[in-house]
């Protein structure tokens, strides 16, 4: 269970219109909306949480239900059984969540590490995903089962264990924001979420990052897919998003190139929630031709 410090941080970032729901092993935030459109499910990145999506949830159209999960091992969501999970393990949890909510189909957004999960769900369970958005995509490192994590990935959980959540977040968090000294609220939101990271959930997510192969799943996509990234992202730079957009099969292409969101770094939905919401509302309301 999360500590009281985590709970208080979460409460500060929640809206009265958003409900916290424990759905099986997953802790989620739900902003209820009309039932005549598929809900939108939001999957966060490795250093983030469901409550990080609050500004975006406020800015998105109220014409649909919006759900933001805490990934397995984050907040009050139960960690996965394997200490070295792969993307299929996380994708299975998404499908269990959809089944528990009796949702035959959703629109799906993944941010950063969440793009690995979102793309795998859409590629392997295409009937469950109507439209997809990959925001600040990460390619993953593609290590084979049993291989050691790349040093840069292995260092993450080790550093968390050594420093503790607060110091870890203070060190790593500002890099996610473009010109953090001028975006105090966004930077503090990043740090607040990152300070709640715990083991084993963060270490399991590092294994997902190490083993992920985003382009393999992107090649299998059939649903209309948006790829977008902050123009100033130094964590997953725009060239990565361009590669992802170029790898989409013709039937998944909605725009000829990745969309660049100007003036934003990696934490794009916290830096410019209104701009990101407008982009997503257009994408998820379009008819694919």
Where are the regions a protein language model picked out?
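Alpha/beta-hydrolase fold catalytic core
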Residues: 1-40, 61-64, 103-104, 257, ...
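Conserved HGGG/HGGXW glycine-rich cap/lid loop of the alpha/beta-hydrolase fold
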Residues: 24-79
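Conserved acidic catalytic loop of the alpha/beta-hydrolase fold
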Residues: 89-106
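Flexible "cap/lid" loop of the alpha/beta hydrolase fold
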Residues: 119, 123-124, 129-162
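Conserved alpha/beta-hydrolase catalytic His-Asp/Glu region
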Residues: 144-149, 161-219
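Short beta-strand/loop motif that positions the catalytic acidic residue
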Residues: 221, 227-229, 233
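Catalytic histidine neighborhood in serine/cysteine hydrolases
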Residues: 242, 246-266
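Catalytic histidine-centered segment of alpha/beta-hydrolase-like enzymes
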Residues: 264-273, 277
